[in-house]
Amino acid sequence: NRQFILCTNNENNICRDVTYERLKKVIENQGYDAGLKYLQVGFVEKKDKFYYEYAGELLKRVRELIELENFIDLPSNTSCALVCTEEDFDSFTAHLPETCRTVYLSNDILPTEEQEQLLMQNNIKVNIVPEYYYSDLED
């Protein structure tokens, strides 16, 4: 049961074209029940912008950060959840997964008092995103 993160500057495309492909073939050929993702880091410009103007762009990148931090694949994992809309949060709290321990909520979701109590009763930690990962960017 191995977990690792491979980081590189991808000089001469060695990460994408060689290492990633090699790992992918090993997983496929050996029949491992494993996951493999290739992520690229980008830059979100914040100069001369208000926080709300670039928060949406940051939110688009949060899923990968959650998966990296928790060594999970969000769609198939029930211990963590990412909720980005009020409607999804209403559905999430109405059908709360028993195994969920952490929920990452978009910064524009405002839980009701009942929803907050439900999360506390079920010992579910709430992290507001993108602030959880990018708190140092707020002016």
Task: Explain the meaning of each model-derived region.
Residues 2-139:
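Accessory, often C-terminal, charged low-complexity segments
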